[in-house]
């Protein structure tokens, strides 16, 4: 018997399922910094969110992170944060498993593509359910980053 690492409330939302068992009865979910299995019968699929997504995205080489919670904030390890302003969400017209995000401020701009696909973080050996490709533009030029995202409760 496996140990219980956490619990999902009966009304929990934004539960990120990153993998499904072969028999499709169990889903691997992230709870904070750990992953665990939950019985899929207790979860309901929501393909297109009805509220703004709150995401934390990150990648390596260089180590970077991005907070997407109403506003976009981008940071490279040991560097200053780049405030990118309010986020505009653009849903795909022909797919429910991807979307684009756009943000612009006086300090920089963001164009990001978020996709619902398994993504692995090689530094933590954790699986995530969302991948990201982000183009960041600032006074220093433009740079393209790829990585993983997770839902923020």
Language model features with spans:
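Boundary regions of SH3-family modules and the immediately adjacent low-complexity/disordered segments
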Residues: 22, 27-65, 124, 129-134, ...
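Central antiparallel beta-sheet cores of small beta-barrel/beta-sandwich binding domains
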Residues: 58-113
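Beta-loop motif signature
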Residues: 1-25
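Short, well-ordered turn and helix-capping elements at secondary-structure junctions
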Residues: 12, 42, 116-118
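Short amphipathic beta-strand/extended segments with alternating polar/hydrophobic composition
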Residues: 3-9, 38-40, 77-94, 113-114, ...
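Short polybasic amphipathic segments
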Residues: 1, 71-77, 130-134
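A generic short-segment signal for beta-strand/edge and adjacent turn/coil regions
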Residues: 6-7, 25, 34-37, 43-45, ...
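Polybasic/polar functional segments that serve as interface/processing modules
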Residues: 91-104, 108, 112-127, 133-142, ...
């Amino acid at each position: 018997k496996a140990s219980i690492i956490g619990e999902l409330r009966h009304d929990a939302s934004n539960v990120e399922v990153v993998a499904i068992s072969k028999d499709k009865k169990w889903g691997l979910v992230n709870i904070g910094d750990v992953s665990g299995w939950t019985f899929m019968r207790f979860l309901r699929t929501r393909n297109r969110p009805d509220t703004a997504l709150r995401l934390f995205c990150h990648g390596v080489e260089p180590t970077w992170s991005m907070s997407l919670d109403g506003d976009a904030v981008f940071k490279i390890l040991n560097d200053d944060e780049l405030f990118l302003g309010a986020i505009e969400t653009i849903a795909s017209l022909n797919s429910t498993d991807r979307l684009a995000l756009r943000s612009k401020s006086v300090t920089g701009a963001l164009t990001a593509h978020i996709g619902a696909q398994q993504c692995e973080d090689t530094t933590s050996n954790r699986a995530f359910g969302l991948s990201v490709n982000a183009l960041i533009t600032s006074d220093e030029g433009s740079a393209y980053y790829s990585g993983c995202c997770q839902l923020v409760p």
